[in-house]
A protein has these predicted regions:
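Flexible glycine-/small-residue-enriched beta->alpha junction loops
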Residues: 51, 55-78, 104-113
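Extended glycan-interaction surfaces of carbohydrate-active proteins
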Residues: 1-7
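Functionally critical mobile loop/hinge segments
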Residues: 3, 74, 80, 85-206
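Hydrophobic alpha-helical hairpins/lids featuring a short glycine-rich hinge
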Residues: 7-61
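Long alpha-helical scaffolds in large eukaryotic adaptor/regulatory proteins
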Residues: 38-41, 59, 63, 94, ...
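Short glycine-/small-residue-rich flexible loop motifs, especially phosphate/cofactor-binding loops
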Residues: 32, 64, 85
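Glycine/charged-rich beta-loop-alpha catalytic/anionic-binding loops adjacent to active sites
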Residues: 7-17, 59-70, 114-120, 181-190
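Active-site nucleophile and cofactor-binding loops and adjacent substrate-binding regions
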Residues: 19-25, 45-49, 67-80, 123-127, ...
Length: 206
């Protein structure tokens, strides 16, 4: 929680532009905490982190910024799903358990953009809570807790519930979540900020 808040609070977090998401701010703290708990190797921690970034970035690409338009922060929402896979990998979950972890975190993924209206500090919390949510979901799944089996495409899954507005739902392309999988690594498309501010402002700053 604290590492995620710190990463995002400093506003120097890296950005996956196509997914409009700061994936590292949630997935790396999640990987660090879970790896420490299970005494994982550095290699296993990095593999889990990469899996989380890939998942969160690709989910962000599906909605093409649509979450922003309806008031949700993709870093918090998509980061939660990425973190459930990070923790799940490090906990050794099988395929069914990983599905359950994602189905559980569906009920935890959040991040309101209302902070933009009055400068509230809650934005900084989003990646930290995403990490906590992912870890919690993975541990619950490991113990047999049952989550939604269709967390993304279900009737009330992520894309139908969060993007219920026809304009944004129609613009979503689920195929982008798996396009080029194992061939195209979205982590290679993560940009490093030259300035500690929202990347949309960098052109003006420069």
């Amino acid at each position: 929680l604290i590492n995620g808040i710190l990463c995002h609070g400093l506003d120097f977090d890296d950005t996956h532009s196509a997914g409009v998401i700061h994936a590292t701010t949630s997935t790396f703290p999640c990987a660090l905490a879970t790896a420490g708990h299970v005494n994982a190797s550095g290699k296993d921690m990095l593999i889990a982190y990469i899996i989380g970034v890939e998942a969160a970035a690709r989910l962000g690409m599906v909605v093409k910024g649509g979450l922003h338009q309806i008031g949700f922060h993709p870093t918090g929402v998509m980061g939660s799903f990425g973190c459930s896979l990070v923790a799940g990998r490090l906990l050794g979950l099988n395929e069914e358990q990983l599905t359950m972890a994602q189905g559980i975190v569906l009920s935890m993924a959040a991040g309101s953009l209302e902070f933009l209206e009055d400068g509230a500090w809650t934005k900084r919390m989003h990646p930290g809570w995403a990490a906590v949510s992912g870890i919690t979901a993975a541990f619950l799944a490991k113990e047999g807790y049952v989550g939604a089996s269709r967390p993304y495409e279900g009737r009330f899954g992520l894309f139908n519930a969060y993007l219920s507005h026809p304009e944004y739902n129609a613009a979503s392309d689920l195929s982008l979540a798996t396009a080029g999988l194992r061939e195209t690594w979205e982590i290679e498309n993560v940009a490093i900020k030259p300035f500690p501010a929202c990347h949309f402002t960098h052109g003006c700053i420069d």
